[in-house]
Amino acid sequence: MAQKIVRVGDIQIGNDLPFVLFGGMNVLESRDLAMQVCEEYVRVTEKLGIPYVFKASFDKANRSSIHSFRGPGLEEGMKIFEEIKKTFKVPVITDVHEPFQAQPVAEVCDIIQLPAFLSRQTDLVVAMARTNAVINIKKAQFLAPQEMKHILTKCEEAGNDRLILCERGSSFGYNNLVVDMLGFGIMKQFEYPVFFDVTHALQMPGGRADSAGGRRAQVTDLAKAGLSQKLAGLFLEAHPDPEHAKCDGPCALRLNKLEAFLSQLKQLDELIKSFPAIETA
């Protein structure tokens, strides 16, 4: 089964290639913090030889509480992303929540992301696809892996096959998510690159009454389990002070653990991809 390769600048993304990191912070809390976080990611990924794309949101439109911090908004967010790209020479990925945002975001960002909660919204999917940007499609918590084929088809019929699928866990009762490792293989059958969002798979949605809880202590276990499935990449959020992060701090890796964390994952990825495939059907 031939696997597609998606190109973002000089980066090649594919399930059989060395893993790519989509990493950064949950939301653009400030310009200075974004620069600090990106600088550390760049230092570590350059040292380890991991292809890297900076990630952050300019607007968190699906917060639990109306009083929760959402971000700087579209205009200011794009200015920060432009500065990050110019300063660190890295591609950028961010999420789009409404059709009108797709084109202006795609003009700045190298990859635009379809949020899990919105992944069946046809108008949004089509607007994003028509930009011809690379699209990272988050699998909704309520969708089976095989149902992602319908979203891929919407994008393809809108003229875009520069697509990535991303697992982020499935609802398991109330306030909990689980990751079905068999789902990765199902999505890989569509031949597009598959990523694993380990950060949001650790969420406990609504677990803190007015915000999501999380299980940061298990991030290494879950990341290793995911990359053992021979994936194109990992989606990760980190923060220098998770206890005071403005969104999803309980899920965020401590920034000072980034190098040790990624070093182990790179070794695992290299080992897994050195094994020949075994036909067991």
From Swiss-Prot:
Any one of the GO CC terms: Gram-negative-bacterium-type cell wall
SUPFAM superfamilies xrefs: Aldolase
Domain of life: Bacteria
One GO term (biological process): keto-3-deoxy-D-manno-octulosonic acid biosynthetic process
Primary location group: cytoplasm
Subcellular location: Cytoplasm
Keyword flag Transferase: yes
Enzyme class, UniProt record, top EC level: transferase
Pfam families reported in the protein's UniProt record: DAHP_synth_1
Molecular function GO labels: 3-deoxy-8-phosphooctulonate synthase activity
Protein name as catalogued: 2-dehydro-3-deoxyphosphooctonate aldolase
Lineage of the organism: Bacteria, Pseudomonadati, Pseudomonadota, Gammaproteobacteria, Pseudomonadales
